[in-house]
Amino acid sequence: MSNRTEQQIRQHWTPAHAPLLSILCPAYNQKAYIAQTLDSFLAQQTSFAFEILVNDDASTDGTAAIIADYAQRYPNIIRPILHAENQYQQGKLFFPDLFNRAQGKYLAYCDGDDYWTDPLKLQKQVDFLEANPDYVITYHDALITDEKGSHGVQLTGEWQRDANRMELLRGRRISTLTTCFRNVLHELPRELEQAPLLDVCWWSMLGAHGKGKYMPEIAPGAYRVHNGGLFSMRAGKQKLHMSLQTYACLANYYQRQGDQPLYEYYLVQVFGLSLSAISPLQKLNALLLVARNVSANLFKRLTLSASRG
């Protein structure tokens, strides 16, 4: 458990009626990791008030008890949400409730098995967003970590740069645990309720509000890979299916919004992923079927997508 007292954490905070930033942390059966995660939050050195919302989805391994212990020690910082029954198994999403509970102008997100390493991370991100209203989200690098240590950066190359609004609208890849963004997402469109990769949907919706800033000056966070990880340990076909379903949800959403370019973009992604696991003959038959039902321009884009798959 962190050596910092609540008084030490709050000593430089500007008096305020509400926290400027809310840290959102969903947790489930992460007893071995949750303490390190919470300690990395409590290590943050800021001039502003922040709160920590930890949502435990009825863990069975003692995770909830650890969260409750931390909340008792830091009652003015940690707000635990401890469910007696598993909400996920009932088809209920954590996102709407957790986001609506957040009091902050800004949100930072980190799962209960990941953690941060830079004690000035939040201060740097909030300072940037306060000074740059045309940006809606900030992010930085994360290292892939397991019991043997770190194994390189999670997202490299083309992802280590700023993102324009269109890239965000198109669900640009961002390391979720590194993000700090404006609290402008209050309702989840009905089409996105069944999307397995909710963070991709968040980035797309945030694109309607501004740009993304990559901040390499922030020390990398830790993206933990382990057998209990909800996404990191999924098989390739499972990840493909999750991406396909997410893009299909986004296509339906933008179709209802009347945004034809984004609807077609996500439709192309769905088509390409769908074709990636089938035979050449099946691809040809699918293309012939689609050719009879879409515009020439869209068919050309679908064909290019098929050739890449």
Region locations from a protein language model:
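N-proximal low-complexity "stem/linker" segments adjacent to membrane-targeting elements
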Residues: M1-A43
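Cell-envelope/extracellular polymer assembly enzymes that use nucleotide-activated donors
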Residues: P19-S22, E51, C201
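Acidic helix N-cap motif at the loop->helix transition within catalytic regions
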Residues: Y33-A35, D61-Y70, Q90
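A conserved acidic beta->alpha catalytic loop
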Residues: D56-A65, E85
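Glycine-rich, basic loop-to-helix element that forms the pyrophosphate-binding segment
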Residues: H83-A102, K124
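Conserved nucleotide-sugar donor-binding catalytic segment
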Residues: N100, H140, T156-Q238, M242-T246
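Short aromatic/hydrophobic "clamp" motif used to bind/position activated sugar donors
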Residues: L107
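Conserved donor NDP-sugar-binding/catalytic core segment of glycosyltransferases
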Residues: L120-V153
